[in-house]
Amino acid sequence: GILHVTLAFVNPGEQVLVPNPGYPTYTSLSKILGAEIVNYNLREDNGWQPDFDELENMDLSRVRLMWTNYPNMPTGGNARRETYERLVAFAKKHNIVVVNDNPYSFILNDKPMSLLQVPGAKDCCIEFNSMSKSHNMPGWRVGMCVSNPTFISWILKIKSNIDSGTFRGIQLAAAEAYNTNTP
């Protein structure tokens, strides 16, 4: 998903906002694809939330994509509802697509929260989830990408030209595990 979204939204020479600390693949794939990385800091004294004042002081004119990851890897920090609301407002103000990589939500939270619960988030945000963590299916490569129909069509155009899909048996097993909440 990280590759597909980056290919769909970022051209060489454009910028990607990446959390520090954060999942290294956001940086490595963006660099491979010719994007410039702009790190934004997550600090413990701020609950591992983005510092929106710091972000607003950056030159964001070439930023196309912003990665977030809540619950955060490697800190374990959880987003707050206010953080998600501010991310949506930030994305709309600066015409940036925010992607929340959310694979740990079902195992680290009693009440999982989604960025897409914020009104208007689907206009400017994408959210991933993965069954590799929540249902112990690593290597099956089964996950979810949720957004608006236009964004999804762009991502699917990239995906369909990279691979031919997941084996049907794996899809059926994943659907059953998800529907019955069988980890």
Which sequence ranges carry the predicted segments?
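Phosphate-binding glycine-rich loop
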Residues: 1-15
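Short, intrinsically disordered, charge-balanced linker/junction segments flanking boundaries
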Residues: 13, 58, 85, 177-183
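A short helix->loop->beta-strand "cap" motif at the edges of active sites that frequently abuts
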Residues: 14, 35, 93-97, 121-123
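Hydrophobic/aromatic ligand-binding patch that stacks against planar heteroaromatic rings
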Residues: 8, 28-30, 90
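Active-site phosphate-binding strand-loop segment of PLP-dependent enzymes
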Residues: 38, 42-113
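Conserved core segment of the aminotransferase class I/II
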Residues: 120-183
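Aromatic/hydrophobic pocket-lining residues that form π-stacking "cages" and hydrophobic walls in ligand
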Residues: 4, 26, 87, 115
